[in-house]
Amino acid sequence: MMSKVCTIAWVHGTVQGVGFRYSTQREALQLGLTGYARNLDDGSVEVVACGEADNIEQLIAWLKAGGPRSARVEKVFTEPHQPDREYDKFSIRY
């Protein structure tokens, strides 16, 4: 059994209004991750991903590579995250 970890990421650039959260959700679900993606007031998207470390790294690499074609990612900040609860799915928050 591999250990489950969580990472929080903030994605900056042209990432709102371009289907970014939906694409991130689809990508995360394919990787078996839980967590959420939500738009922040500063125009960035916050992503919390929990699951196998390797799969989280794949999601972060996908985010850094630019995510969906319609988006333009300028920078991605990540740090380890200790959520206050367990996520049972990967959801889109509003």
UniProtKB/Swiss-Prot annotation:
Keywords: Hydrolase. The active site is at 21, 39. Its EC number is 3.6.1.7. It catalyses: an acyl phosphate + H2O = a carboxylate + phosphate + H(+). NCBIfam families: PRK14426.1, PRK14451.1. HAMAP family: Acylphosphatase_entero. This is Acylphosphatase. The gene is acyP.
